[in-house]
């Protein structure tokens, strides 16, 4: 019988239940040696090779004093230097190109699998980083090779001031509150909105496990697109009209009709669940053939959804 997959809490004083109740989407958590051996999952030469492919999403961020520059991949061989200080290479969805990196997702089996977006891997030369910023999604920062200093600030939102004209969404007034130095195997969890700034201490590789967190606008946009594929048999109908309704006035009764028409969709839980399951299991790169086949799965009331479709196989 195979042994259970390791989790982040095998060498931690807390367990998954405590983490979900007290930390998940609430406050940061540092776990030393959460994933020992993480530095062996991928090296910088493998990252450089991935960044040369047109099928792989990558970018290089360089910092010089207070100036930032971002260059999108793919990159020609030799363009990325391991010796230029203040440089960072970021490669998205490395879990789709490296079986070893993909195995790291097993450590997060205490969370819904369909919430995981991808594992981004970044290589940085000495003093490299992407600047102080915050994310709208949960992220686990796992230290691979080398060391990285992480400074954490307060909670941010859409009203937090950013540096104008910067190629990245960088915080204009970042005030560190806590500082951690991560070594190979260490893990730092950050909930959405926490300001953070990572700086390489020598050559450094960080693996970032990010989670899908669609905005309300994105949800409505996809739901509306999904509705367009249905037969157009639900039309707006007027409330009871009187001659006094002629002219330009918008009556509350009309808004009630519109609201009722839209509520038919959001109040239909089965319909909503079917759409959401297909939406959240849609592959990140549906048209790209990857080394590790992209597999996103969700179950709901006896139905199984795989990669954006309900699976009819028993």
List each language-model region with its residue ranges:
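Active-site region of the double-stranded beta-helix
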Residues: 2-22, 35-186, 194, 199-235
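Fe(II)/2-oxoglutarate
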Residues: 2-8, 171-181, 197-314
């Amino acid at each position: 019988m195979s042994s259970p997959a390791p989790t982040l809490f095998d060498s931690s004083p807390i367990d998954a239940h405590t983490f979900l109740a007290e930390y998940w989407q609430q406050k940061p958590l540092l776990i030393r040696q959460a994933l020992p051996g993480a530095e062996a999952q991928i090296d910088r030469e493998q990252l450089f090779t991935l960044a040369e492919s047109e099928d792989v999403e990558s970018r290089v961020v360089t910092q010089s004093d207070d100036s930032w520059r971002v260059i999108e991949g793919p990159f020609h061989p030799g363009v990325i230097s391991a010796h230029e200080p203040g440089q960072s290479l970021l490669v998205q969805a490395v879990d789709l190109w490296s079986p070893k990196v993909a195995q790291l997702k097993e450590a997060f089996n205490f969370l819904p699998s369909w919430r995981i977006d991808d594992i981004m891997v970044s290589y940085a030369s000495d003093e490299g980083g992407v600047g102080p910023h915050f994310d709208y999604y949960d992220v686990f920062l796992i230290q691979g090779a080398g060391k990285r200093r992480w400074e954490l600030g307060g909670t941010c939102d859409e009203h937090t001031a950013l540096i104008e004209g910067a190629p990245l969404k960088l915080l204009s007034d970042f005030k560190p509150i806590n500082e951690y130095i991560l070594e190979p195997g260490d893990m730092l969890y950050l909930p959405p909105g926490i300001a953070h700034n990572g700086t390489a201490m020598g050559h450094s590789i960080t693996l970032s496990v990010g989670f899908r967190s669609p905005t309300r606008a994105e949800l409505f946009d996809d739901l509306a697109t999904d509705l367009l594929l249905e037969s157009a048999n639900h039309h707006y109908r007027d409330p009871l009209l009187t001659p006094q309704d002629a002219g330009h006035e918008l009556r509350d009764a009309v808004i009630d009709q519109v609201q009722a028409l839209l509520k038919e969709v959001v109040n239909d839980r089965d319909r909503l669940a079917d759409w959401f399951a297909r939406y959240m299991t849609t592959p990140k790169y549906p048209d790209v053939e990857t080394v590790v086949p992209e597999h996103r799965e969700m179950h709901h009331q006896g139905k199984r959804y795989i990669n954006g479709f309900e699976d009819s196989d028993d």
